[in-house]
């Protein structure tokens, strides 16, 4: 039961995640902080290598939900999703994100677990 539902172009979100992930490495791991807002998601990551930020357009209202993800897990789910646009169903910053096709088909369903974020 996820009250927050947004739609996003798979390629656009993958590209945003890729740009933000440049500061993340095997030695310097950090979650990607996602702030879902109305019509956009703000992505950021901070490590000893520096800080990276990006914005990706979405359809829907993320209700200011802030959630962290391991960049690899979220990127893998999006990379293997056989759809140009996906639906992300969210609830809280500590509950899983469910990724499904926008058209309502049942070709895939990915569940990505969040990472607890430290206060900024």
Feature map (PLM): residue ranges:
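DNA polymerase processivity clamps
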Residues: 1-120
């Amino acid at each position: 039961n996820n009250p927050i539902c947004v739609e996003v172009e798979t390629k656009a979100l993958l590209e945003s995640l890729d740009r933000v992930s440049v500061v993340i490495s095997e030695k310097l791991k950090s979650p990607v902080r996602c702030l879902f807002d109305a019509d956009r998601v703000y992505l950021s990551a901070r490590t000893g290598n520096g800080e990276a930020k990006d914005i990706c357009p979405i359809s829907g209202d993320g209700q200011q939900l802030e959630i962290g993800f391991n960049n690899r897990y979220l990127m893998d789910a999006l990379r293997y999703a056989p759809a140009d646009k996906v639906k992300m169903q969210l609830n809280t910053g500590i509950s899983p994100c469910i990724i499904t096709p926008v058209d309502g088909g049942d070709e895939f369903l990915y569940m990505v677990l969040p990472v607890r974020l430290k206060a900024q």
